[in-house]
Amino acid sequence: MCIRDSIKPKVEDEEYRLRYITGGMLSTAELSILQAHKEISLFAERTARMFNMVKELFYEKNEETFLKTYSRIEKYENISDRMEIEIANYLTEVSEGRLSSESKEEIRIMLRAVSEIESIADSCNNLARSIKRRNEFKSEFTEEQNKHLDHMFELVSGALNRMNLILHKPELVHDDINPSYNIENEINNYRNQLKSRNIEDINNKLYQYQDGVYYMDMVSESEKLGDYVLNVVQAVIEKKI
């Protein structure tokens, strides 16, 4: 089963709770760090679920269903804020004990990863807000705009799936980062293409200027999200090799 198929919202994911570091520090710093890594992996999976909800929200026409999904995304964002703080506090507590220089460096890198994962959640929430604004102002995208955003969302999903595979992979080599770089380059290049195309399409009166603003907000936020994903992968590979 691939990560994409396995990341589906479950009832227990709707509530805030840590799974691996709830009982405080373990007997050794190494064991505590291992538990924190498991918690970070779970945190990353939550952000992938959030992005799946964003994709659902994009096409949702039923207002009641839309608001329900939007509220779930907001809830996940609040959970993400709390998870970031709890994991960071735990790692800070672990770092205050007797640690090897290697373990101290590992904690530093993990703290960086946690911050970047929370930024992914922020981006998902920003995308949801952009979609909500588009709907509130009765803006409608053309078929071409929808196709372009579909492709951008698929690229971002690919980046998230790769991130989660890396987080669950026990042994890593430096070349494991290459697929993530390739996806990130695709996202950046596609963003640049869409930015140029948007200016042309507005000039050709294919849609209104404000429609283009909402559209490019989503394109730009998707590209930012991809940056945060790559930062997580870089941190994890730096820690494991």
Where are these regions (language model features)?
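Cytosolic, long alpha-helical scaffolding segments
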Residues: 4-241
